[in-house]
Amino acid sequence: MAYQNDVNFIREHVQELDVIDQLLEEIAELQIACCKRKRSLKGTNPTPWTADEAQQSIKEESQDVLNVLCAMGVFGFDDPEKNSTERMKRKMARWVNRVKMKKA
């Protein structure tokens, strides 16, 4: 319940436009981490980050994005009505189908 209390605190004390700014910042940081991961894996454009460091950054930035989405009321872990697990499963299945169709 502590997590939900923290989410509620943010909702009550941070204006929506500021939360949107926070989301944009976190998305940008996630994008940078993804670019670093790609560069480290490809190896043709060196980066000081190792692939493992970039992967860890992707995990961290993804969590930051999810936290902001929870604060916005778009996604929720504690509220079944806002938990998007079923929708995510359907979208993953569609993605798998598209990949399978391309390989066929």
Question: Residue locations for each model-derived region?
Answer:
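Flexible "arm" and connector segments at domain edges
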Residues: 1-104
